[in-house]
A protein has these predicted regions:
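Glycine-rich phosphate/pyrophosphate-binding loop shared by adenosine-nucleotide-utilizing enzymes
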Residues: 3, 53-57, 83
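A short beta-loop-alpha structural element at the N-terminal edge
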Residues: 3-16
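Hydrophobic adenine-recognition pocket in adenosine-nucleotide-binding enzymes
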Residues: 8, 88-93
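Active-site rim helix/loop that mediates acceptor-substrate recognition in acyltransferases
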Residues: 25-51
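Conserved acyl-donor/pantetheine-binding loop and adjacent beta-alpha core of acyl/acetyltransferases
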Residues: 59-87
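Conserved acetyl-CoA-binding loop-helix of GNAT-fold acetyltransferases
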Residues: 90, 96-109
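Conserved GNAT acetyl-CoA-binding A-motif
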Residues: 111-121
């Protein structure tokens, strides 16, 4: 029952889109075009897998990324270098099971070697 964090694969994007759009009001909805843009441009786009099933995903961008989020722009105006977590989504049936904790540990390990600041909304 271990959690595996790994890079997303192209054939999983439909499942990621469904996870995102079923996550509730705290997560902005995505369409397929925007999700594919994330896939092509995000510096960090990883999924969590538990028991062979998709359990969630996290998308992040470095400060030099061409990302169109107003929240990202706010950080860009204030910090010269940072890594921005755009969204983290955990499948409802996997919440409370350590998936979010595993994601934050992984993204922190990734970002701390590359950026002086880790940011999110």
């Amino acid at each position: 029952m271990s959690i595996v964090i790994r890079d997303v694969r192209a054939h999983e994007l439909d499942s990621v889109l469904a996870l995102n759009n079923n996550a509730g009001l705290a997560i902005l909805p995505l369409d397929s075009a925007k999700l594919h843009r994330f896939y092509e441009t995000a510096e960090y786009f990883r999924v969590a897998e538990r028991d062979g099933n998709l359990a969630g995903f996290l998308v992040g961008f470095g400060s030099d990324s061409d990302h169109d989020s107003s929240n990202f722009a706010w950080f860009r105006e204030r910090y010269p270098q940072f890594f921005y977590i755009d969204r983290i989504v955990v499948a409802s049936r996997r919440r409370g099971g350590g998936v979010g904790r595993a994601f934050y540990a992984d993204v922190q390990s990734y970002a701390e070697l590359r950026y002086p600041q880790l940011a999110c909304e």
